[in-house]
Amino acid sequence: NIHELIFFELRERVRFHLEIENEQNRLKFQILELLHQTFPGLERLFSSRYSIIALNIAEIFTHPDMVLDIDKEVLITHIFNSTDKGMSMDKATKYALQLRVIAQESYPNVDRHSFLVEKLRLLIQQLKQSIHHLKQLDDAMI
């Protein structure tokens, strides 16, 4: 019967959706734990820790030394280019200045060459990919 088939398909999609959400929650927890080791305070930069822009910035600047080692203009450009939603140069500049202050005040437990810095970057990439896949699944259901 067609109704049973549709119901089955929807139920399986919802089940898979929940599995992906659970995986994302696990990744978010791991990312936050690692950030406390590699770049304490970075999570204060954005109101939404797991927005794509926040994840892009955290992926590029996984350690405060990476912020402090580049000049302000390069930092502003990285932030400006880290979202596809469009951001004003003024807002990018504001974020860059905030990020600099956070980096100066941050006391990480590991240095920039620690494996934890690389691990953090990989987990952020996994989370971004998972968010993208979930969006594709949701779009396919509509």
Write out the residue ranges for each language-model feature.
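A detector of single, family-specific signature residues
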Residues: 1-142
